[in-house]
Amino acid sequence: MVLDMMKMFLRVFVAAFGALLAAAPAHADCFDEAAKYQKVNPLILRAIAWQESHNRPDAQHKNANGSIDYGVMQINSVHLPVLAQYGISQGTLMEPCKNVYIAAWHLRRQMNKYGNTWQAVGAYHSETPSLRDKYSQQIVAILRKWNLMPAAR
């Protein structure tokens, strides 16, 4: 399983140029820099941006539970207390490049918990297993649509 994930990430990395073009409106260099800084896959970040906001840096969404998702990566307001310790406010979340860096940080936290797995990718959205698994499959579907992953067998 881990070897398959590593092979998939290598294939995804080789095809980076295609995704770079697909995610251009969200400052591609921010994705690359944030991913490098947090040691996460930039293509996964780009797919998350597409899933979350279709690369709209001004996106905001009020959830049924009263929380709010902010920016291109739809960072949830439940993270604001932790982010405030680093001087990050709600307004900061609406700055596209900073939003991507915060998303990379959040994804890294999930990878530290779950490893370099699809569970970690899904946990970016939710740690509830059914929601986590559904989300990771949505990210896989985006990568397949961008021809960055092989079709399901």
Where in this protein do the model-derived segments appear?
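Bacterial N-terminal signal peptides that target proteins for export
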Residues: 3-13
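N-terminal signal peptide c-region/cleavage motif recognized by signal peptidases
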Residues: 22-25
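Catalytic glycan-binding domains that act on GlcNAc-containing polysaccharides
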Residues: 27-153
